Design a protein with these regions (language model features):
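Serine-esterase "nucleophile elbow" of acetyl-processing enzymes
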Residues: 1-48, 58-67, 182
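Short, flexible loop segments at the rims of nucleotide/cofactor-binding pockets, characterized by
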Residues: 47-51, 134-135
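Alpha-helical cap/lid subdomain in secreted, periplasmic
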Residues: 57-202
Length: 202
Protein backbone atom coordinates (compact mmCIF):
# COMPACT_ATOMS: atom_id res chain seq x y z
CA UNK A 1 0.00 0.00 0.00
CA UNK A 2 1.40 3.37 -1.05
CA UNK A 3 0.58 6.67 0.64
CA UNK A 4 0.28 9.97 -1.20
CA UNK A 5 0.57 13.43 0.39
CA UNK A 6 -0.85 16.39 -1.56
CA UNK A 7 0.11 19.94 -0.55
CA UNK A 8 -1.48 23.04 -2.01
CA UNK A 9 -4.46 25.35 -2.27
CA UNK A 10 -7.88 25.37 -3.94
CA UNK A 11 -6.60 23.48 -6.96
CA UNK A 12 -5.47 20.61 -4.76
CA UNK A 13 -8.71 20.34 -2.78
CA UNK A 14 -10.66 20.63 -6.02
CA UNK A 15 -12.74 23.68 -5.18
CA UNK A 16 -16.16 23.43 -6.89
CA UNK A 17 -15.85 19.74 -7.82
CA UNK A 18 -16.72 16.58 -5.90
CA UNK A 19 -13.92 15.28 -3.64
CA UNK A 20 -13.43 12.18 -5.77
CA UNK A 21 -12.98 14.39 -8.85
CA UNK A 22 -9.96 16.28 -7.54
CA UNK A 23 -7.00 15.86 -9.86
CA UNK A 24 -5.08 14.05 -7.15
CA UNK A 25 -7.90 11.53 -6.65
CA UNK A 26 -8.30 11.01 -10.39
CA UNK A 27 -4.54 10.51 -10.61
CA UNK A 28 -4.70 7.96 -7.80
CA UNK A 29 -7.48 6.17 -9.71
CA UNK A 30 -5.20 5.89 -12.74
CA UNK A 31 -2.24 4.75 -10.65
CA UNK A 32 -4.42 2.05 -9.12
CA UNK A 33 -5.60 1.00 -12.57
CA UNK A 34 -1.96 0.30 -13.39
CA UNK A 35 -1.80 -2.13 -10.49
CA UNK A 36 -0.47 0.03 -7.64
CA UNK A 37 -2.29 0.07 -4.31
CA UNK A 38 -2.88 3.65 -3.11
CA UNK A 39 -4.35 4.54 0.30
CA UNK A 40 -7.59 6.43 -0.20
CA UNK A 41 -8.61 9.11 0.14
CA UNK A 42 -5.34 10.84 -0.64
CA UNK A 43 -4.09 12.83 2.36
CA UNK A 44 -4.47 16.52 1.52
CA UNK A 45 -3.12 19.59 3.30
CA UNK A 46 -4.66 22.42 1.30
CA UNK A 47 -7.25 25.16 1.54
CA UNK A 48 -8.77 27.66 -0.84
CA UNK A 49 -6.93 30.97 -0.70
CA UNK A 50 -3.71 29.74 0.82
CA UNK A 51 -0.41 31.35 -0.06
CA UNK A 52 2.97 29.70 0.37
CA UNK A 53 3.42 30.99 3.91
CA UNK A 54 -0.08 29.93 4.93
CA UNK A 55 0.51 26.43 3.60
CA UNK A 56 3.79 26.30 5.50
CA UNK A 57 2.01 27.33 8.72
CA UNK A 58 -0.61 24.61 8.23
CA UNK A 59 2.10 22.01 7.67
CA UNK A 60 3.79 23.10 10.88
CA UNK A 61 0.52 22.61 12.77
CA UNK A 62 0.13 19.16 11.20
CA UNK A 63 3.54 17.93 12.35
CA UNK A 64 4.74 15.28 12.49
CA UNK A 65 3.90 14.59 8.85
CA UNK A 66 5.23 11.06 8.97
CA UNK A 67 6.62 9.08 6.05
CA UNK A 68 5.06 9.13 2.58
CA UNK A 69 5.68 7.33 -0.68
CA UNK A 70 4.69 10.24 -2.92
CA UNK A 71 4.30 13.98 -2.37
CA UNK A 72 2.80 16.61 -4.64
CA UNK A 73 3.00 20.40 -4.46
CA UNK A 74 0.86 22.97 -6.27
CA UNK A 75 0.94 26.45 -4.74
CA UNK A 76 1.44 30.10 -5.63
CA UNK A 77 -1.65 31.40 -7.38
CA UNK A 78 -2.76 33.33 -4.30
CA UNK A 79 0.68 34.88 -3.90
CA UNK A 80 0.28 36.23 -7.43
CA UNK A 81 -3.34 37.26 -6.92
CA UNK A 82 -2.44 39.26 -3.81
CA UNK A 83 0.40 41.01 -5.61
CA UNK A 84 3.28 39.49 -3.68
CA UNK A 85 6.77 39.64 -5.15
CA UNK A 86 8.34 36.70 -6.94
CA UNK A 87 11.50 36.74 -4.82
CA UNK A 88 9.54 36.16 -1.62
CA UNK A 89 7.53 33.44 -3.30
CA UNK A 90 10.71 31.78 -4.54
CA UNK A 91 12.16 31.55 -1.02
CA UNK A 92 8.95 30.20 0.49
CA UNK A 93 8.39 27.77 -2.37
CA UNK A 94 11.89 26.39 -1.96
CA UNK A 95 11.21 25.81 1.74
CA UNK A 96 8.04 23.91 0.79
CA UNK A 97 10.12 21.77 -1.55
CA UNK A 98 12.31 21.00 1.47
CA UNK A 99 9.18 19.87 3.30
CA UNK A 100 7.98 17.71 0.42
CA UNK A 101 11.41 16.14 0.08
CA UNK A 102 11.58 15.39 3.80
CA UNK A 103 8.18 13.69 3.62
CA UNK A 104 9.53 11.17 1.07
CA UNK A 105 12.90 10.57 2.73
CA UNK A 106 14.70 13.04 0.45
CA UNK A 107 13.94 11.11 -2.74
CA UNK A 108 13.38 13.72 -5.47
CA UNK A 109 11.92 11.10 -7.80
CA UNK A 110 9.01 10.76 -5.35
CA UNK A 111 8.04 14.45 -5.51
CA UNK A 112 5.75 15.88 -8.20
CA UNK A 113 5.22 19.62 -8.66
CA UNK A 114 2.51 21.19 -10.81
CA UNK A 115 2.76 24.68 -12.30
CA UNK A 116 0.38 27.51 -11.42
CA UNK A 117 -2.73 27.60 -13.64
CA UNK A 118 -3.60 30.84 -15.42
CA UNK A 119 -6.75 31.97 -13.62
CA UNK A 120 -6.99 34.93 -16.00
CA UNK A 121 -8.05 32.51 -18.72
CA UNK A 122 -11.37 31.74 -17.03
CA UNK A 123 -14.84 33.31 -17.09
CA UNK A 124 -14.04 34.85 -13.70
CA UNK A 125 -10.83 36.30 -15.08
CA UNK A 126 -12.58 37.76 -18.11
CA UNK A 127 -15.06 39.57 -15.86
CA UNK A 128 -12.76 40.68 -13.05
CA UNK A 129 -11.45 43.89 -14.59
CA UNK A 130 -7.78 43.01 -14.12
CA UNK A 131 -5.17 43.40 -16.86
CA UNK A 132 -5.10 39.80 -18.06
CA UNK A 133 -1.92 40.25 -20.06
CA UNK A 134 -0.21 41.33 -16.85
CA UNK A 135 -1.79 38.45 -14.93
CA UNK A 136 -0.40 35.96 -17.44
CA UNK A 137 3.02 37.60 -17.35
CA UNK A 138 3.11 37.46 -13.56
CA UNK A 139 2.05 33.82 -13.53
CA UNK A 140 4.78 33.08 -16.06
CA UNK A 141 7.32 34.75 -13.76
CA UNK A 142 6.16 32.66 -10.81
CA UNK A 143 6.29 29.51 -12.90
CA UNK A 144 9.79 30.36 -14.07
CA UNK A 145 10.88 30.47 -10.43
CA UNK A 146 9.20 27.09 -9.89
CA UNK A 147 10.90 25.65 -12.96
CA UNK A 148 14.33 26.77 -11.82
CA UNK A 149 13.89 25.34 -8.33
CA UNK A 150 12.62 22.01 -9.61
CA UNK A 151 15.35 21.74 -12.23
CA UNK A 152 18.07 22.42 -9.68
CA UNK A 153 16.75 19.62 -7.47
CA UNK A 154 15.83 17.10 -10.19
CA UNK A 155 12.16 17.28 -9.19
CA UNK A 156 9.53 16.59 -11.83
CA UNK A 157 7.33 19.51 -12.88
CA UNK A 158 4.12 19.16 -14.87
CA UNK A 159 3.06 22.24 -16.85
CA UNK A 160 -0.70 22.51 -16.34
CA UNK A 161 -0.62 26.22 -17.18
CA UNK A 162 -0.52 25.38 -20.86
CA UNK A 163 -3.65 23.25 -20.48
CA UNK A 164 -5.58 26.03 -18.73
CA UNK A 165 -4.69 28.36 -21.59
CA UNK A 166 -5.23 25.88 -24.42
CA UNK A 167 -8.75 24.98 -23.26
CA UNK A 168 -9.76 28.39 -21.91
CA UNK A 169 -12.59 28.77 -24.45
CA UNK A 170 -14.10 25.36 -23.64
CA UNK A 171 -16.86 25.78 -21.03
CA UNK A 172 -16.56 22.09 -20.10
CA UNK A 173 -13.14 22.80 -18.63
CA UNK A 174 -14.41 25.33 -16.07
CA UNK A 175 -16.26 24.58 -12.84
CA UNK A 176 -19.61 26.21 -12.14
CA UNK A 177 -17.94 29.00 -10.18
CA UNK A 178 -16.23 30.18 -13.38
CA UNK A 179 -12.84 30.29 -11.70
CA UNK A 180 -11.65 26.79 -10.89
CA UNK A 181 -11.04 23.85 -13.21
CA UNK A 182 -13.79 21.31 -13.80
CA UNK A 183 -13.49 17.58 -13.22
CA UNK A 184 -12.84 17.26 -16.96
CA UNK A 185 -9.85 19.58 -16.75
CA UNK A 186 -8.55 17.74 -13.71
CA UNK A 187 -8.85 14.53 -15.71
CA UNK A 188 -6.44 16.02 -18.27
CA UNK A 189 -3.98 16.78 -15.47
CA UNK A 190 -4.25 13.25 -14.11
CA UNK A 191 -3.76 11.71 -17.54
CA UNK A 192 -0.76 13.94 -18.20
CA UNK A 193 0.79 12.80 -14.92
CA UNK A 194 0.25 9.15 -15.81
CA UNK A 195 1.83 9.70 -19.22
CA UNK A 196 5.07 10.79 -17.54
CA UNK A 197 5.40 7.26 -16.12
CA UNK A 198 6.87 8.87 -13.04
CA UNK A 199 5.70 6.26 -10.56
CA UNK A 200 5.71 3.28 -12.87
CA UNK A 201 8.15 1.36 -10.68
CA UNK A 202 6.44 1.76 -7.31
Amino acid sequence: MHHLLALGDSYTIGEAVAPDQRWVEQWADLIQAEGHAIARPVHVIAQTGWTTDELAQAITLAQPLGAWDLATLLIGVNNQYRGRDVDGFDREFNALLDTAMAAVADRPERVQVLSIPDWGQTPFGAACGRDLIQVSAEIDAYNQAITQRCSARSIALLDVTVLTRRFSADPRMHAEDGLHPSAAMYRLWAEALICTGKFGRL
